[in-house]
Amino acid sequence: IEDIISHNQDVIVIVDEAYVDFGGHSAQELLSKYENLLVVQTFSKSRSMAGMRIGYAMGSAELIKALNDVKYSFNSYTMNRTSILLGTASIEDDVYFKETVEKIVNTREWFKAEMKKLGFTFPDSKANFLFASHPKVPAKEIFEAAREKDIYVRYFDKPRINNYLRITIGTDEEME
């Protein structure tokens, strides 16, 4: 990421860290070094607050001022008092947050190991989902069979990913 930022000083580089809490590495440490870096995070994934539309951006004072100058023109998801209170509470309860993220990561790794026993393969995941493929059974076939059993995964009929399923990690009970 630093290589991209350093070689593109004439543009704003936005790093979306929606899934960083699940094991990724944040670019926050680069903020003091690069004026053209904007790091954005959401409460939708690791804080399980997708419907609240809460997130934040970190960057130079100039970038943040520019965002503030246009936020009411382009932001159709302005925050109401309930969202602000719930977002604040989620930040203040760091113990619960860390326990929740750890549980999701542990469930993801357990599920991945179980699915590997069935022949599935996965690229490395640092998110709350797995991208799964089976060498002998087409993803579309698995998708349709799962849907018939009320198991909902995502299938993308697109080149390069049409033999993969996106499996969101739920509770241990749901994943069993």
Regions of interest found by a model, annotated:
Residues I1-V13, E17-M49, L63:
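Active-site pre-lysine segment of PLP-dependent enzymes
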Residues V15, Q41, D124, V153-Y155:
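Hydrophobic residues in well-ordered beta-strands that form the structural core
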Residues N36-K116, F120-P123:
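PLP-dependent aminotransferase class I/II
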Residues G51, K126, R160-N163:
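Short acidic/glycine-enriched loop/turn segments that link adjacent beta-strands
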Residues G59, A132-K136, I169-T171:
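Short beta-strand-to-loop capping motifs
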Residues V105, A113-K149, L165:
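Conserved PLP-binding catalytic core of the aspartate aminotransferase-like
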Residues A145-K149, R154, K158-E176:
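PLP-dependent enzyme catalytic core of the Aspartate aminotransferase-like
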